[in-house]
Amino acid sequence: MASEIFGTAAIFWVLIPIGLVGGALLLKLEGD
């Protein structure tokens, strides 16, 4: 069970920064 919680946390730690960076890049591209 602990491994499942760790895996889920790891997924969020990876996806959240990617989402933030991806969103920022999209806004930058639309701005240009």
UniProtKB/Swiss-Prot annotation:
Subcellular location: Cellular thylakoid membrane
Membrane listed as a keyword: yes
Single GO molecular function: electron transfer activity
Alphabetical keyword list: Electron transport, Membrane, Photosynthesis, Thylakoid, Transmembrane, Transmembrane helix, Transport
Any one of the GO CC terms: cytochrome b6f complex
BP term (GO), one: photosynthesis
Listed name of the protein: Cytochrome b6-f complex subunit 7
Species of origin: Synechococcus sp. (strain CC9902)
